[in-house]
Amino acid sequence: MMHVRYILQTCLFLVISTMAVAQPVSGELIGADSVQKVMIIPFNQYNYFSDADNELAEKNEMSATDISTMFRYGLNYNISTRVIATDGAYNILTDTTVSSAKDLELIYASVTYQFEKPVDVTVPDTLTDRTIKQPDLFGMGEQEPVKEEKKKLIDVKKEDEEPKNEKYLNAHVTHPEIFPVLQQKYHTDIFLFINSFELVTNYNHCLDRSKNYFERKVVVHYSIYDANGKQLKGDAMTVTFSSQQTNVDEIIATQFPVIAEYLAGTVTHVAQTDAPDTSTKK
């Protein structure tokens, strides 16, 4: 497997080099004097995790593959719609050209994934010591022991206070030279990676015992980069709902806009923070 991956990485480097020769590459932000354009990169199907697909497939009379495809396109559509409202957006998933399909595969081939602590360019302390030792897609793995004084604070936490993510699945781009190439080709300044999609049922939290309804959540892991390959943000966004909601179209229509609205706002915030100061100094 390592030998095969080495060959793929070598081929990828050659392809990117060829693309770079075919057109000028600067890495300078195109959107410095205008609205920035965001490339939305959907999650790879290999990074789709769900413990509810069998149930949803039966309720919706479709295959599990159809369920994951609908969630993938539904999430991408919602995100692009919200991003367009504040920034420009390029949706590579719905671009039907042969070139864009190949470029999406190149992007996937240039990315590796690792669990890390959330990172935010607006919070400098998050840019160091980000590695997490326990990779666990469903958040059920072991965690580091909590010190006694911290444990007391956790016990008295308000019920309506959302817990912060301790880890998320980050996208590491092994060939950052692909960013300015894609920027020149698609005129995009910001790259929003949807790294993984999780649909998880919490069977320890029963919402209605008479009807056997449990808490269910969608977790979307994401990373945001600029055209220079600088990571601006990385975290996971979670929405929680009842397992009573089993209609796929309804889940997409009610839950995904919440995720999309958050991501669109996050992109705008970090992009503005990262934008160069073009004001004239006197």
Model regions and ranges:
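Bacterial Sec-dependent N-terminal signal peptides
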Residues: M1-I30
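Detector for methionine-enriched segments
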Residues: M1-M2, M19, M39, M62, ...
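Short secondary-structure boundary/capping segments
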Residues: M2, N54-E58, R209
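N-terminal segment of the mature soluble domain
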Residues: N54-F193
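C-terminal/domain-edge helix-coil "capping" segments
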Residues: Q23-D51, S68, D155-C206, S210-K282
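An exposure/low-complexity boundary signal
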Residues: S17, Y108-Y113, T280-K282
